[in-house]
């Protein structure tokens, strides 16, 4: 099991609708890929933890790095883990308004 945490900055402001769409898309795709994690969004920044098969997680992170909605993608840490920290979350989410969506 592998976990990667990154920080990125939005290139244009996300509307609440765009954030909901992004989250729905991430949840569908992550579930299909066997990836779990969480996403925080605040003041134009994303902090995301992804966990799953190392090759799959790295491939998804490379795709996110190429996504025109993200800039300044910085990997904060990458490590092998014994077990998932977000096992029940296809993608937990917390926005700048202070609402959690698990």
Where are these regions (language model features)?
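Charge-rich, low-complexity N-terminal segments
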Residues: 1-99
